[in-house]
Amino acid sequence: GQARFVVHGRASHAGGAHEEGRSAIKELAYKIVEIENMTNYETGVTVNVGVVSGGEARNTISPCAEALVDLRYPDPQQGLDARDQFEGIFGDVLSYPIETTEITTDSWINLHRPPKIPTPESDNLLTKTLAIGRLLGLDIGTTDSGGGTDGSLSQAVGLPTLDSLGSSGTGAHSEREQGVVSSLVERAQLSAVLIQRLAAE
């Protein structure tokens, strides 16, 4: 899932009229702590505030601040629960003991990609793939990646789907990300044999 929220405060001079301002950045900071605390590794729910922006000038109490949030969850109900938590955080003023009309938050929440839940059909496809891997002498394992995939959309409508048949690598989405060139041939062989066998069924 994903969310975007924009906090609206009230601009004022950071020196001469500090007390008259309502810092959107300050409120955003409080909300970010609450949002990040939603992460629970035991249940598989992860939340990441990945992009933050705001403010107009160093000497101006910020009238506006924005954050983009990524949400991952293994069970659909967890997504709905997280959405409710987001709405509660967005609806409260956390950084000032004032009426909520002085600081407001606009939010957009989109549970756009369901979790990819195994089915008997996808398990059968996986079993065939692992068997082919063994025949080719490949050490192939399975794991929950926490990744977002179009495969979750196809699987949700009944099409058994496997992910991660491409090259292997490490350090995804970081400056350490790298692919293992030698795995390209191995994975191509695996995919070719799998497609051939499925076509023959």
Predicted regions and their residues:
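Metal-dependent amide/peptide-bond hydrolase catalytic core
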Residues: 1-201
